[in-house]
Amino acid sequence: MEIRWLSILVDIPADRFDRSMEFWSAVTGWRPGRPIGDKDEYVPLDPPAGDRYLWFQRIGRDIPGCHLDLHVDDLDAAAAEAQERGARLVNSVDGLRVLDTPAGQPFCFVTEEPGRTRQAPPPPETASGRHLVDQLCFDLPAPDFERDADFWAALTGWRRRGQEDEFDRIAVPAWLPAQFLLQQLDEDAAEGPHAHLDLSADDRDAEAARHRQLGAEPVRRTADWTTLRDPAGLTYCVTGRRTGLRFT
């Protein structure tokens, strides 16, 4: 299976969708694109250069979240391979297959346009420096961590870099727009598997302050990242990684 592109889907409850879109458009400087879907439930943010990869989905449930879409040529073959590796097929519709990882993390396969060549957008730049939504972090309960880390490496063909403390990485090719980080939750964590956005920033504190001015709520600050909550209640992190740094 060849992965042709990837998209990050931010799942936002319908009653908070417009406010969240406004916030993330202001954060990135990217304008909302044309909605698609039977109910116009999918809206991209379109960068001025490069290809879109950050989408927002209007959902009926009350809890926001994130999931990954992998673009492939053959949906059925990709879904079959994922199931052979332990995934569960949840739904099958035209142009889309919805699955859960062995740990229960939702993800999708979508049909890539034949012959399409894509390019990752460059980082936006503001007074606080460069910044970019460039990582999806999979938050996994301790008993599920190894199983899902091995699943993603086997499914994509991209190697695990090796666990350090509670983290591991899947070595995503540098031409794709976002990286995968896996985080092992504490043994006593009540949450099930979920995912969150990470942003890299040249100046983490200045970037986090800009987000607060745009309406984000501060949650906590550690030595390596600052956790915030967007106006829809979506928790995400601004990290101290150098903007554009890729782990391959």
Language-model segments: which ranges?
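Core segments of cupin and vicinal oxygen chelate
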Residues: 1-52, 77, 84, 90-92, ...
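Short hydrophobic/aromatic beta-strand micro-patches
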Residues: 11, 69-71, 139-141, 198-202
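Short proline/glycine-enriched turn/loop motifs at strand-loop junctions of beta-rich domains
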Residues: 63, 73-75, 201-205
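Vicinal oxygen chelate
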Residues: 1-3, 12, 83-134, 140, ...
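Conserved donor-binding loop and adjoining core beta-sheet/short helix segment
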Residues: 56-60
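Eukaryotic phosphotyrosine signaling hubs
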Residues: 65-67, 192-195
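Short glycine/serine/proline-enriched coil/turn segments at secondary-structure junctions
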Residues: 62, 188-191
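Domain-length accessory/inserted modules outside core catalytic folds
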Residues: 45, 187-188
